[in-house]
């Protein structure tokens, strides 16, 4: 029901545009004169309409509908409904009477009756294009497939009606079929006269289809027509970020946020602004904008993750880790393995930073625990064991205890089964094991690993020198 009400509200304005008084009728000037009195002198207007309907016009259904529409345009729904009914009583097969009746129903928030009346108008006159369009609009936000079916019927019957492609674009947009929506709008804009709303919708469709260059051009055209259009100013900023035009994006952001009290800002606006600031290394300002986004909407855990990334770029690892923990805690359900991996790697990088040497044991322990979970969750992937090996190398920098040995061996066992294994990773695993056995003075075993490296990378200087030293 709520969707129907929203649809009705959006259509009330369209109803008046799609059903104007027929031009050229001999009584059109009198209707317009009387209509001008409806608001300020309804009695005089009623009397004037009554005079028009005397004599030969007593049963003029076209005139009755024109009068009814004049009342509807002034918000007089009851009077409009009365004239629509009078027209139907005189000629129950007059499609325009049902079209007006449908418009009145829309104004009264009765979408079911409106769609029924529009359908009846189509049944009575298959060339009543407005009825197809209005029926499609009623269902656009409720059952878009019904809208689509009706519009396709109209397009087959009236391929030159430029309004069809515009409405198809709106329906496809509602259905999330942005590629088709873009094509429909392109077809419309080639022959139609775009409005501010058309430019806005088309620019959005281009953005959603990742046609950022094209979207930029449409945004510029739209802003020429409507320089205060909030959505177009938003898209200017969004497009520039996607195109990596960061300076232009910051200029667009300054324009977009020039009125800080605008109630139409959404959390994503602050996220995009923050990303622009981050891209230009204005990290403190970026953090402030990310936090504004969180204040506005805490239902998007990825914001915590982006905050963590900014802190990491500042090498503020304690804050980066704290923000990442906030991210993991805000997730609904268990974190993905990729999330755990990135958290483990963050702790590893913190452990390698000499500025936090006093916290190194804490970071190492956290990283080791997390990478152990990764190895357990995806046993066929080398990453968990490989990064555990790196972490334990920090615990045993001289390789005297061989703390990393079992993890490099486990990673190597997986990697050797993969034809596309990274050469650099294979070299690292074999290098550690070669050096470990060298320290243990087990030279034959050490040579095995150094030779494996030369099989992978014949020009590897470290392996060559190690073998020369053993000889």
Model region roles, listed by residue range:
Residues 436-439, 451-456:
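Short, flexible active-site recognition loops that position polar ligands and cofactors
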């Amino acid at each position: 029901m709520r969707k129907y009400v929203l649809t009705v509200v959006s259509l009330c304005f369209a109803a008046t545009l799609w059903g104007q008084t027929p031009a050229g009728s001999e009584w059109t000037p009198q209707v317009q004169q009387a209509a001008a009195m409806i608001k300020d002198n309804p009695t005089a207007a009623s009397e004037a309409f009554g005079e028009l309907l005397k004599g030969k016009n007593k049963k003029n259904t076209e005139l009755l509908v024109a009068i009814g529409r004049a009342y509807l345009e002034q918000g007089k729904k009851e009077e409009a409904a009365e004239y629509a009914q009078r027209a139907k009583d005189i000629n129950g097969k007059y499609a325009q009477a049902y079209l007006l009746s449908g418009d009145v129903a829309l104004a009264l928030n009765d979408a079911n009756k409106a769609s029924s009346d529009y359908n009846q108008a189509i049944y009575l006159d298959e060339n009543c294009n407005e009825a197809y369009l209005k029926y499609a609009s009623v269902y656009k936000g409720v059952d878009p497939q019904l809208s689509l079916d009706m519009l396709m019927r109209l397009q087959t019957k009236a391929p030159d009606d430029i309004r069809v492609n515009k409405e198809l674009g709106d329906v496809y947009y509602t259905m999330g079929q942005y590629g088709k929506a873009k094509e429909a709008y392109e077809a419309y804009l080639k022959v139609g006269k775009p409005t501010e709303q058309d430019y806005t919708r088309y620019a959005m469709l281009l953005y959603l289809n990742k046609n950022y260059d094209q979207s930029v051009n449409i945004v510029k055209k739209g802003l020429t027509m409507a320089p205060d259009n909030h959505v177009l100013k938003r898209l200017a900023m969004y497009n520039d970020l996607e195109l990596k035009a960061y300076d232009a994006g910051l200029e667009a952001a300054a324009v977009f946020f020039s009125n800080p009290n605008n109630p139409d800002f959404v959390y994503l606006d602050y996220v995009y602004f923050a990303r622009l600031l981050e891209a230009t290394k204005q990290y403190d300002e970026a953090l402030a904008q990310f936090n504004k986004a969180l204040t506005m909407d805490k239902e998007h855990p990825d914001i915590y993750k982006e905050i963590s990334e900014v802190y990491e770029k500042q090498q503020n690892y304690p804050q980066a880790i704290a923000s990442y923990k906030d991210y993991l805690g805000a997730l609904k359900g268990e974190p993905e393995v990729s999330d755990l991996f990135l958290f483990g790697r963050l702790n590893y990088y913190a452990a390698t930073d000499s500025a936090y040497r006093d916290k190194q044991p804490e970071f190492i322990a956290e990283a080791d625990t997390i990478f152990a979970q990764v190895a357990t969750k995806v046993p066929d992937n080398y990453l968990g064991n490989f990064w555990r090996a790196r972490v334990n190398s920090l615990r045993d920098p001289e390789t005297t205890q061989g703390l990393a040995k079992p993890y490099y061996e486990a990673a190597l066992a997986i990697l050797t089964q993969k034809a596309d294994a990274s050469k650099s990773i294979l070299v690292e695993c074999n290098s550690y094991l070669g050096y470990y056995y060298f320290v243990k003075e087990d030279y034959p075993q050490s040579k095995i690993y150094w030779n494996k490296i030369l099989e992978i990378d014949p020009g590897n200087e470290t392996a060559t020198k190690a073998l020369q030293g053993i000889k």
